[in-house]
Amino acid sequence: MTNIRKTHPLIKIINHSFIDLPAPSNISAWWNFGSLLGICLIIQILTGLFLAMHYTSDTMTAFSSVTHICRDVNYGWLIRYMHANGASMFFICLFLHVGRGLYYGSYTYFETWNIGVILLFAVMATAFMGYVLPWGQMSFWGATVITNLLSAIPYIGTTLVEWIWGGFSVDKATLTRFFAFHFILPFIITALVMVHLLFLHETGSNNPSGLISDSDKIPFHPYYTIKDILGILLLILALMTLVLFSPDLLGDPDNYTPANPLNTPPHIKPEWYFLFAYAILRSIPNKLGGVLALALSILILMLFPILHMSKQRSMMFRPLSQCMFWILVADLFTLTWIGGQPVEYPFIIIGQLASILYFMIILLILPVISLFENKLLKW
């Protein structure tokens, strides 16, 4: 009798994806973040589902319903903080996953890469809409500021913003539709993840050396299932430490004040994982220019396969590119810091310089260094 694992129409798909999948023998811990992102997505969908059972998407009761979840629902505080901090863990894993892809040249699988960038956009949209739902001060003003950016689009901008708002300001209609979109998007993300994996399994995984590893493959199970379980345990440990010891560490105190359209908070800023993009947006004095720079700060990832000039795939054996990569990482940390600072000297100029450097490294410096390293290969 043949093994059901290899013959059953459904089980054989799982088998080819997670059990008998040929995997490179030398992939490091940087390859763990894909599975960690999968776990983050599952945690977010489950905690979100239980929160949705008790949440009401109405401007009069939204803030109170979140308070009710934390005070009266069994382990509601745990579910709420796991969901809020789960988003932070999600973005930490996302940034590390993208950084791994850039460092080791995984973007040369351009279908997988481009689906990944679309996934990044979808997760960012979901997180933004989720931040609006508790209907605190930062929820309301964040929604107002970010949706207002669309008014910079020539001719249709104002109409578009009012259409998204469902009125002339962020109000009940906006909250209701944001809740609906926030609920449906994670399932769309799950479908995109399956497409992401489909394209990845067409080519097989990359590895740290960037070389073809067809001659040296090992089965995914048990080697990488065990490795992934270790990563998952560490992720859950980090998440639960954050949730149980310092649940509000990454949040904004202003969001514990109910939304008030008549009172603007002194510093409107998004959650920490959007601060780098927010800093790029603010560094340009022109509204439309800022919006374009904001969109390009993420869309630029799609250009990496075109901008790859090196004869080597990975940065493993390219010390000059490595150096530039880590300068880019430091620049992103700088932008994140600037995004959380008030708009005044010296933060304005630092933000502008960091934004210019961000685009310069990606569009000019890295490709030029790659061409120089190609020359060094001949010496």
From Swiss-Prot:
Note: Heme 1 (or BL or b562) is low-potential and absorbs at about 562 nm, and heme 2 (or BH or b566) is high-potential and absorbs at about 566 nm.
Protein name (Swiss-Prot/TrEMBL): Cytochrome b
SUPFAM superfamilies: a domain/subunit of cytochrome bc1 complex (Ubiquinol-cytochrome c reductase), Transmembrane di-heme cytochromes
GO CC term, one of those recorded: respiratory chain complex III
InterPro entries cross-referenced by the UniProt entry: Cyt_b/b6_C, Cyt_b/b6_C_sf, Cyt_b/b6_N, Cytb/b6-like_sf, Cytochrome_b, Cytochrome_b_C_euk/bac, Cytochrome_b_N_euk/bac, Di-haem_cyt_TM
Family under the similarity heading: Belongs to the cytochrome b family.
Binding site for heme b b562: H83, H182
Bilayer topology term: Multi-pass membrane protein
Organism listed in the record: Tamias obscurus (California chipmunk)
Role: Component of the ubiquinol-cytochrome c reductase complex (complex III or cytochrome b-c1 complex) that is part of the mitochondrial respiratory chain. The b-c1 complex mediates electron transfer from ubiquinol to cytochrome c. Contributes to the generation of a proton gradient across the mitochondrial membrane that is then used for ATP synthesis.
Localisation: Mitochondrion inner membrane
Cofactor note: Binds 2 heme b groups non-covalently.
